[in-house]
Amino acid sequence: WCEFVSLPENSPEAMEAHTGVPAAEVRGAARLYANAANGAIYYGLGVTEHSQGSTMVMGMANLAMATGNLGRDGVGVNPLRGQNNVQGSCDMGSFPHELAGYRHVSDDIVRHQFENHWGVTIQSQPGLRIPNMFDAAIEGTFKAIFVQGEDIAQSDPNTIHVESALRSMELVIVQDLFLNETARFAHVFLPGTSFLEKDGTFTNAERRINRVRPAMRPRTGKHEWEVLCDVAKAMGGTMHYDHPSQIMDEIATLTPTFAGVSFERLDREGSMQWPVNDANPDGTPIMHIGKFVRGLGKFHITPYVATDEKASRRYPLLLTTGRILSQYNVGAQTRRTSNVAWHPEDVLEIHPADAEERGIRTGDDVTLASRVGTTTLRALVTDRMTQGVVYTTFHHPVSGANVVTTDNSDWATNCPEYKVTAVQVSPGKSAATAETNHPAHRLNALVRMANQIARQMAADNTGDPVAATALDRKSTRLNSSHT
């Protein structure tokens, strides 16, 4: 590794040509980090949403090991998760290649443990990642999808490709708080529950497991885990729980890092940081003290490999997308609040020189085009942007920012390369702009369907005709508001 970093092509001077960051600043930042008593690295999607995102994370881990910034308070390599419980979802095996506790499906011992407990057979080969699902759906080999709490039709890159995949499937089930863009393709829509109605745990980026308690019962009458149990039962499965604490007990039984976790302990003692087991009965505030699980740390070679997405004569600008403080992700929740006063629409930020060259002024409608799609946004001319780079957000479905982003992704994780898309910007609206608004008749049908499901769930759970009547009145208001 030392030989690798000493190569001339890996020097700050060589990298300056690729990044535009002066070599002197890179050296100064490196010395500041290396000489700090405690140096902590925090990173977000600006690092990972590149074709070489995983390589960059490995590079940061190399820096932390080389400078001794691991295994004690105030140091480490710390990902800033996009929202609460991303860590918890990963811990529970929300990957196509791992079971709970980050154990690979190819491990026969681990797989058989889960098979014996669940009474099912688990494939030893990894499943599909989301982009692979879309490709397989278009090819006709992927037939159905169950989407919970995610709007893939708005958030995933290359919207036209995603919509084609959704249309190709025989069954699309969407479970969410709101009728989002993906719900336009749903054969079945199931109402979801908010965090105020959930009973369970959230785990944050420091591996801290916190209890989450409901402030109210779900308006639909059932928790999401109960709905999943009903679906499993209808499909011939045996998934059954009477309380979410039983789910945590199963997690503790099957996952060594959670072996000592229970609702009873969390309610009595407060939050806990995994691993919590016989070796660490009170939890583990700091990991990697003195050594790693594998022993000594392993330095990874991290060669620079340029993205395949490059500016060209036809697409001379580079688009990067991101978020803004007042809106959250695809805006399914925040667009329904007064936050729209601060961010009523997605705009395209463009450098004054690039705007002048194209005859564009602030407030003008502009066409944003890439090799995969075209959309229309309003321009914001600002020297905040670097010349040659444009920026927009993706909070509003009408702007369809992901219509133009491509299928390029990280080499290891398939995380989309949202930060680099070659585009052209021209004045005026595009005739090819994708229409992403819900057709009124389709939206009304979905509203009626969702309310019918909610009424049935409420009746099944409580037998209360008053609740069903209240939902009928709400259904009328909802349909009127969307007509």
List PLM regions with ranges.
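Long, well-ordered, tryptophan-enriched scaffold segments
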Residues: 1-36
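Long, low-complexity segments enriched in small/aliphatic residues
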Residues: 90, 95, 113, 244-338
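Short, conserved loop/helix-junction motifs that constitute active-site signature segments
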Residues: 164-168
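A glycine-rich, hydrophobic/aromatic-adjacent loop/helix-cap motif
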Residues: 33-135, 278-280, 290-296
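Short, well-ordered beta-strand core segments
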Residues: 39, 145, 172, 189-191
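Long, contiguous, secondary-structure-rich segments that constitute the structural scaffold
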Residues: 218, 222-272, 278, 337-349, ...
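Conserved short loop/turn motifs at secondary-structure junctions
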Residues: 15-21, 44-51, 83, 149-154
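Flexible glycine/proline-rich, aromatic-decorated loop/lid segments
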Residues: 178-213
